[in-house]
Amino acid sequence: MKTIVVYYSLEGNTAYAAEKIAAALGADTLRLQPKKAYPSSGFQKFFWGGKSAVMAEKPALEPYAFRAEDYDCVILGFPVWAGNVTPPIRTFVLDNSLRACRVAAFACESGAGAEKAFHKLVDCAGIDRLRETLILIDPKTKPSEENERRIEAFCAALRG
């Protein structure tokens, strides 16, 4: 099964998890980058990131190489912003039909909102469901055995 992990990461938590998942599954990776970067700290990070997520904005992305037909499974990874999928992931799923792929997702959060974000992702991507989901609490900045166990279980479920 050919797999790719497509993700957006602002502070490194999602990138950390994406690399671990890709290594465990032997998957390709694609890190999405918006043409205009989001602020990475302070009040502006929460204001602009939250506004962009709540308003369902679709930011332009830096060019990337991806063809859905090259993959059996697409894993989407993102930080949760105001209970929403991050805008770069929204842009990606609106620009690329994933209906023929098995789609899974993982979300990194500091508080709550991942379940709500997964439902919005399903709607935005126009798919029936996510094959597997994974919620991590700040996996890079607050490493824990629980996060590691969750990553292992997620990968095992995707292999099976």
What are these regions (language model features)?
Residues 5, 76, 104-107, 132:
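Structural beta-sheet core signal
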Residues 1-76, 83-85, 90, 94, ...:
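N-terminal beta1-alpha1-beta2 submodule of the flavodoxin-like/Rossmannoid cofactor-binding fold
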Residues 31-34, 106-107, 132-138:
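A generic structural motif
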Residues 116-125:
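Short, aromatic/basic amphipathic alpha-helical patches
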Residues 129-160:
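Glycine-rich phosphate/pyrophosphate-binding loop and the adjoining helix
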Residues 68, 94-101, 124-128:
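Short, conserved loop/helix-junction motifs that constitute active-site signature segments
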Residues 38-42, 115-116, 141-143:
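Short, charged, surface-exposed secondary-structure boundary motifs
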Residues 80-83, 109-113, 138-141:
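Short Gly/Pro-enriched loop/turn and capping motifs at secondary-structure junctions
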